Curated annotation (Swiss-Prot):
<protein>
    <recommendedName>
        <fullName>High-potential iron-sulfur protein isozyme 2</fullName>
    </recommendedName>
</protein>
<keyword id="KW-0249">Electron transport</keyword>
<dbReference type="GO" id="GO:0051539">
    <property type="term" value="F:4 iron, 4 sulfur cluster binding"/>
</dbReference>
<comment type="similarity">
    <text>Belongs to the high-potential iron-sulfur protein (HiPIP) family.</text>
</comment>
<keyword id="KW-0408">Iron</keyword>
<feature type="binding site">
    <location>
        <position position="70"/>
    </location>
    <ligand>
        <name>[4Fe-4S] cluster</name>
    </ligand>
</feature>
<keyword id="KW-0813">Transport</keyword>
<keyword id="KW-0479">Metal-binding</keyword>
<feature type="binding site">
    <location>
        <position position="54"/>
    </location>
    <ligand>
        <name>[4Fe-4S] cluster</name>
    </ligand>
</feature>
<dbReference type="GO" id="GO:0019646">
    <property type="term" value="P:aerobic electron transport chain"/>
</dbReference>
<feature type="binding site">
    <location>
        <position position="41"/>
    </location>
    <ligand>
        <name>[4Fe-4S] cluster</name>
    </ligand>
</feature>
<keyword id="KW-0004">4Fe-4S</keyword>
<dbReference type="InterPro" id="IPR036369">
    <property type="entry name" value="HIPIP_sf"/>
</dbReference>
<dbReference type="Pfam" id="PF01355">
    <property type="entry name" value="HIPIP"/>
</dbReference>
<dbReference type="InterPro" id="IPR000170">
    <property type="entry name" value="High_potential_FeS_prot"/>
</dbReference>
<dbReference type="GO" id="GO:0009055">
    <property type="term" value="F:electron transfer activity"/>
</dbReference>
<feature type="binding site">
    <location>
        <position position="38"/>
    </location>
    <ligand>
        <name>[4Fe-4S] cluster</name>
    </ligand>
</feature>
Length: 76
């Protein structure tokens, strides 16, 4: 489950860190590969209405979108 209080975190905005985008379809990053989404990354924890908690140190202060992507994506 999610850590206490996580649902109260602000939602990440595009370019929060590591070329993050809320919609993977919006990125033209060289590292992006089709099918890579926050929701299937090893840093992803859980869903709250389409948003989840990211365990990467640069994202622990925000929620990220399941359909999002960033350049430190790592397959789960």
């Amino acid at each position: 489950g999610l850590p206490d209080g996580v649902e109260d975190l602000p939602k990440a905005e595009d370019d929060h860190a590591h070329d993050y985008v809320n919609d993977a379809a919006d990125t033209d990053h060289a590292r992006f590969q089709e099918g890579q989404l926050c929701e299937n990354c090893q840093f992803w924890v859980d869903y709250v209405n389409g948003w989840g908690y990211c365990q990467h140190p640069d994202f622990t202060d925000v929620l990220v979108r399941g359909e999002g992507w960033c350049s430190v994506y790592a397959p789960a």
